[in-house]
From Swiss-Prot:
Domain notes: Contains a large N-terminal NADP-binding domain, and a smaller C-terminal substrate-binding domain.
Pathway of action: Nucleotide-sugar biosynthesis; ADP-L-glycero-beta-D-manno-heptose biosynthesis; ADP-L-glycero-beta-D-manno-heptose from D-glycero-beta-D-manno-heptose 7-phosphate: step 4/4
A Gene Ontology molecular function term of the record: NADP binding
Required co-factors: NADP(+)
EC numbers for this chain: 5.1.3.20
Top-level class of the enzyme under EC nomenclature: isomerase
Cofactor note: Binds 1 NADP(+) per subunit.
Gene3D superfamilies the UniProt entry points to: NAD(P)-binding Rossmann-like Domain, UDP-galactose 4-epimerase, domain 1
Domain of life the protein comes from: Bacteria
Protein name: ADP-L-glycero-D-manno-heptose-6-epimerase
Organism: Psychromonas ingrahamii (strain DSM 17664 / CCUG 51855 / 37)
Active site: 139 (proton acceptor), 183 (proton acceptor)
Function: Catalyzes the interconversion between ADP-D-glycero-beta-D-manno-heptose and ADP-L-glycero-beta-D-manno-heptose via an epimerization at carbon 6 of the heptose.
Record's keyword annotation contains Chaperone: no
Amino acid sequence: MFIVTGGAGFIGSSIVKSLNERGITDILVVDDLTDGAKFVNLVDLQIMDYMDKDEFITQIVSGQDFGDIEAIFHEGACSATTEWNGKFMMENNYEYSKDLLHYCIERDIPFLYASSAATYGGNDTFKEELKYEKPLNVYGYSKFQFDQYVRRIWEDAAAHDETLPQIVGFRYFNVYGPREQHKGSMASVAFHLNNQLNAGENAKLFEGEHKRDFVYIGDVCKVNLWFFDNNVSGIYNLGTGQAESFLEVGQAVVAYHQKGEVERIPFPEHLKGRYQSFTEADLTNLRAAGYKDTFKSVAQGTAEYMAWLNR
């Protein structure tokens, strides 16, 4: 059996889909469906069972035996970079992750989890090293602190010559693609621009030359499953390694629709200083781990995404 936390969410449900494509259906999806709109992500998927996140945490903490677990893909988190309730964020993203990690260590279960490029904050170097990690918001801090916790676990195990199961964290950069529609304001810029053009408006982008490392969801799933297949541990950047501008996203959306144009709007005051204006994954460690596949460009990924959204 596989367990996917956040399995009704964007990345989680996409991993479930990728497992289904391998013929794997013995999957326990864990999520919080208080936002009932997320159920849409599960409609076309084959799963064995669904469990509410709070019930799952209770069972994990009490040491419940779930039977033979091949791996846990831990994608469940509060991913809103605009959320400033630190207590809520640390409970959701840090304490929950620690409980799951120890459950996996005690039972020798591979643990593949979602970290984030938000751990780097306003840096212009995006390499998996402490000196480059300075998060700008409490979401990034919660992810950073769990990465630090994992590093201490590795150090402690090495000092005592202990063997650990696979533990791998992926620092997701700007992921976009199918199954993110429930995220509202946190959905990708491509999603919002598509809605604007379908409403007869122009594609509105903030002023400035902001560039991000936009990575297509299909590539994110491929990396997750490659690491599971190859039993490699570590913390790795998961982006394309190539920053592209929001303008290029806008142009790709306009090119698909063959109408409208990119329109510039003022950058919101409340986001200044709390917003990464540039991200670009350093893929040195990912490539050294053995992952060789290429990543879709913004033009390629956006075209595929637009075809899915407007199907």
